[in-house]
A protein has these predicted regions:
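Ribonuclease/tRNase effector modules and their secretory precursors
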Residues: 1-109
Length: 109
């Protein structure tokens, strides 16, 4: 059985930027569990607006498509590595989850 979270294909960062910027601020939404992995302190600092801003204004250092067809997007944020999992749909982007990862957890693709 394949790991549904394993990245099967690397996406050029420029291609992802062009794709994500086709969506408006309002079309990017919480998928329902996006903030579940965060501590209460992190939830005070990170809200949906911050994640939207990150997606629309910042440049990730790595983007890939997972076996489950979700996008895994990796950013350097405040000196840490941030992994954001997105489900891109025709009319909206759902933030599935996001969390900080260690350097060794960055996939080698």
């Amino acid at each position: 059985m394949l790991d549904p979270n394993k990245i099967r294909k690397k996406v050029p960062v420029n291609d992802f930027i062009a794709l994500i910027r086709k969506y408006s601020h309002e079309q990017i939404e919480d998928g329902g569990h996006a903030f579940d992995r965060l501590s209460s302190r992190q939830r005070e600092l990170f809200n949906i607006g911050e994640v939207r801003k990150l997606l629309l204004k910042e440049w990730p250092f790595l983007v890939g498509i997972q076996e489950n067809s979700n996008h895994a997007v990796f950013y350097k944020h405040q000196g840490k590595n941030l992994r954001i999992i997105l489900k891109l749909e025709t009319a909206k982007v759902k933030i599935v989850t996001f969390y900080y990862i260690q350097e060794w957890q960055i996939p080698k693709i």
